[in-house]
Amino acid sequence: MKKIFIASDHAGYNLKNSIISKLKKITDLGPKTSDSVDYPDYARKLSKKVASNKGSFGILICGSGMGMAIAANKNKNIRAALCYSKKNTKLSRLHNNANIITCLLYTSDAADE
């Protein structure tokens, strides 16, 4: 069975826990609280797990999704993709063989600017 790992920064803590509650088999790599943390630490931790467990996948969550993707992609054998729609997520796997998806919390529109 393929392993799925998940991690976030403090901004993604609640979404991470929501995802965990919906999946039967997933390994939570932290953080364990919503206290402020450095996202690169969690991107590195998850990337190492995915790289060392052949066929596994990862989910990283932060405010923009970009920081986690950049940090994860610095690791060997990692292909992290920022996913913001069902189609984008599917294509990242089919065409780019992504083994980590990064999710964003913050979006922007004209009303927010």
Region annotations inferred by a language model:
Residues 7, 60-65, 83-84, 102-104:
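Short beta-strand segments
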Residues 4-17:
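N-terminal beta1-alpha1 ligand-phosphate binding loop
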Residues 18-25:
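A short, Lys/Arg-enriched amphipathic alpha-helix followed by its capping loop at the start of a domain
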Residues 48-80:
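Helix-adjacent hinge/juxtasegments
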Residues 106-111:
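Conserved small/polar residues in nucleotide/adenosyl-binding loops
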Residues 35-51:
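Glycine-rich oxoanion-binding loops at beta->alpha junctions
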Residues 26-37:
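A short beta-strand-loop structural module common to alpha/beta enzyme folds
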Residues 75-104:
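Short, acidic/small-residue loops that bind anionic groups at enzyme active sites
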